[in-house]
């Protein structure tokens, strides 16, 4: 193709990007019959510090190298990543690029092809997802410039929760606030959608029944699935609500914010930094936002942070089980959920009354 990557009838490669604040994760897929087969997965990590490119093909490492001793910005990292992917495609034509976008509000309920006008609309949600949305959109913007003939498709974390009943979406505020978009949206929807898609192959009864999914990573949330559809989740208007996270508070009495403003004299920006970057496991422990560090530590504040995390997860489990009217299955996913059996055990141990 004269424009390099324009879609044609023979286009058979897809790239998927998840651009975050300190890393850009990617996968490539090849068309295989009526489905897709993943070929590569990897990431550029350490943005802002020591960037590193790692990638695997079918589970076997094919690259692991430091990119720069002086740091890279997102644009430079994406250019390096794009060059690497093109080389690994060995001449295959790129059919499209998929992007994780955290917030789509009420107007984006399904995967959407992005152009400049759509980007402008998505930018309205940056204040509601300041840790993620700017980086998601920056990656799309760059790909539109680098690959002008290739569709850029945004897939939204909020979209999966469109099935949540209105009573679970609304805050107890006058209707004008809901009309302005102040409601509970929920996040991590792409993760929950994947769980819902594979659960039938693991347990048909659970997939058709009542499941609580724990997405426990640096960002943490839970969702109640009824027959694979979301009916409730712990995150809300923003990705702060719900469980304590690596550096985020989780749910907080709004009166605490009033106290910070009125009595402590904190500014909006100071409170924002506290809520998003200085709280959660890091704030409680004074040590680390990484659950692995806390579990390895004998320090009392580290143990307390783990205790609070597990307690809040158990409490939310009870709440979501009540919304479901019972419980048939529990699923754990994401970094902590998949790799920390001690956390899984501590959450489940005190949930025996639910049949766990």
Regions found by a protein language model. Give the residues of each.
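Adenine-nucleotide phosphate-binding core of ATP-dependent small-molecule kinases
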Residues: 273, 280-284, 291-323
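Glycine-rich phosphate-binding loop of actin/hexokinase-like ATP-binding domains
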Residues: 160-261
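Short beta-strand-loop/turn "lid" adjacent to the catalytic site in phosphate-handling enzymes
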Residues: 85-132, 151-153, 159-170
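Short glycine-rich, Thr/Ser-proximal phosphate-binding strand/loop in the N-terminal lobe
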Residues: 14-16, 23-71
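Glycine-rich phosphate-binding loops at beta-strand->alpha-helix junctions
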Residues: 328-346, 350
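Oxyanion-binding "anion nests"
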Residues: 253-256, 260-287
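Phosphate/pyrophosphate-binding loops at sites that engage ATP/ADP/AMP, CoA/4′-phosphopantetheine
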Residues: 83-95, 199-205, 317-328
């Amino acid at each position: 193709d004269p424009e390099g990557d324009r879609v044609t009838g023979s286009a058979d490669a897809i790239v998927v990007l998840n651009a975050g604040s300190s890393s850009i994760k990617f996968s490539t897929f090849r068309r295989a019959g009526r489905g897709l087969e993943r070929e590569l997965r990897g990431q550029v990590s350490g943005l802002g510090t020591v960037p590193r490119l790692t990638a695997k093909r079918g589970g076997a490492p094919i690259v692991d190298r430091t990119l720069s001793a002086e740091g890279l910005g997102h644009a430079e990292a994406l250019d390096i990543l794009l060059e690497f992917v093109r080389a690994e495609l060995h001449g295959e034509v790129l059919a499209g690029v998929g992007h994780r976008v955290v917030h789509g509000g009420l107007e984006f309920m399904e995967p959407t092809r992005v152009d400049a006008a759509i980007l402008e609309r998505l930018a309205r949600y940056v204040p509601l997802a300041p840790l993620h949305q700017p980086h998601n959109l920056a990656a799309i913007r760059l790909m539109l410039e680098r690959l002008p003939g290739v569709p850029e498709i945004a897939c939204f974390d909020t979209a999966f929760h469109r099935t949540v009943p209105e009573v679970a979406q609304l805050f107890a505020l006058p209707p004008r606030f809901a009309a302005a978009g102040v409601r509970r949206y929920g996040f991590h929807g792409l993760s929950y959608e994947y769980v819902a898609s594979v659960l039938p192959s693991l347990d048909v009864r659970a997939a058709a029944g009542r499941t609580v999914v724990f997405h426990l990573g640096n960002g943490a949330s839970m969702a109640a699935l009824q027959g694979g559809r979301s009916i409730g989740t712990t995150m809300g208007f923003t990705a702060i609500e719900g469980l304590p996270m690596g550096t985020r508070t989780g749910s907080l009495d709004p009166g605490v914010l009033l106290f910070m403003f009125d009595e402590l004299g904190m500014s909006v920006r100071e409170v924002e930094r506290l809520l998003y970057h200085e709280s959660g496991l890091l704030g409680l422990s004074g040590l680390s936002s990484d659950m692995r560090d806390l579990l390895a530590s004998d320090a009392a504040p580290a143990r307390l942070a783990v205790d609070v995390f597990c307690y809040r997860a158990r409490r939310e489990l009870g709440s979501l089980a009540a919304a479901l009217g019972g419980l048939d299955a529990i699923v754990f996913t994401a970094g902590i959920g998949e790799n920390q059996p001690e956390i899984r055990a501590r959450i489940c141990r005190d949930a025996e009354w639910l049949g766990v």
